[in-house]
């Protein structure tokens, strides 16, 4: 839209519209209509209800990767709020191609666990064959991978940490990785507010990067690229202090 002093507001270059909603949201009188944005989907922002800087910093201090998941169930509404928060993260050129899927079926979770174990077994063997002690980035070593596999075969869960809920962030957009990471951060902060522990599933993501990608997509029932995975659960304790950084 274009505004010239003393002249009516004009629509210019309508074909370039990315449906971001900024033109509608900026009008204090709700006087702008957009063919792609129904009126009932436009809501007022209550700036008086914003958290203070101190309150927001307290949230940052409290957020941790607390892997002590209990068997307590998550409320459906809480999960919906976490996912909604993720969808309100910005995306490149407003592509909005981030998809967030909840996985809480025990059989599917078991298959994800087995996928990671199988992939790590193959990675460790390949490293041994090539005579390499660690991956190029130094993140994995053959002994580390073998240790994780052995622990899993002994009945422990160093992969999913016993979670009953995974959020899968997917996007095939060229900026999909960045978009999903932003969505993850929004979702993780909402989880913290709700008293739900969230943990980044790095092992799952690394197995996906180094293993049979289509196999994991089929297990999870997704088509786009897997960019981030979050585990959710009620923690058995909370941290009462934080250490300065």
Name the predicted role of every residue range:
Residues 1-245:
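Acidic, surface-exposed loops and disordered segments
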């Amino acid at each position: 839209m274009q505004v010239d002093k003393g002249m009516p507001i004009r629509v210019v270059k309508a074909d370039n519209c990315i449906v971001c909603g900024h033109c509608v949201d900026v009008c204090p009188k709700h006087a702008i209509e957009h063919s792609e944005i129904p009126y009932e989907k436009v809501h007022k922002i209550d700036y008086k209800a914003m958290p203070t800087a101190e309150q927001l910093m307290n949230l940052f201090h409290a957020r941790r990767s607390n892997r002590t998941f209990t068997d307590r169930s998550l409320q459906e509404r809480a999960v919906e709020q976490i996912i909604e928060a993720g969808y309100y993260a910005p995306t490149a050129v407003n592509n909005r191609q981030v998809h967030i899927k909840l996985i809480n079926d025990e059989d599917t979770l078991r298959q994800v666990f087995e996928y990671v174990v199988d992939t790590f077994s193959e990675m460790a063997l390949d490293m041994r064959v090539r005579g390499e002690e660690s991956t190029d980035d130094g993140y994995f070593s053959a002994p580390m991978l073998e240790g994780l596999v052995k622990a899993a075969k002994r009945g422990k869960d160093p992969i999913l940490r016993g979670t009953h809920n995974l959020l899968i962030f997917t996007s095939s957009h060229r900026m999909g990785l960045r978009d999903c990471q932003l969505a993850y951060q929004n979702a993780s902060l909402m989880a913290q507010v709700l008293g739900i522990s969230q943990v980044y599933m790095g092992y799952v993501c690394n197995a996906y990067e180094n293993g049979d990608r289509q196999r994991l997509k089929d297990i999870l029932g997704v088509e786009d690229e897997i960019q981030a995975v979050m585990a959710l659960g009620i923690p058995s304790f909370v941290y009462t202090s934080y250490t300065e950084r």
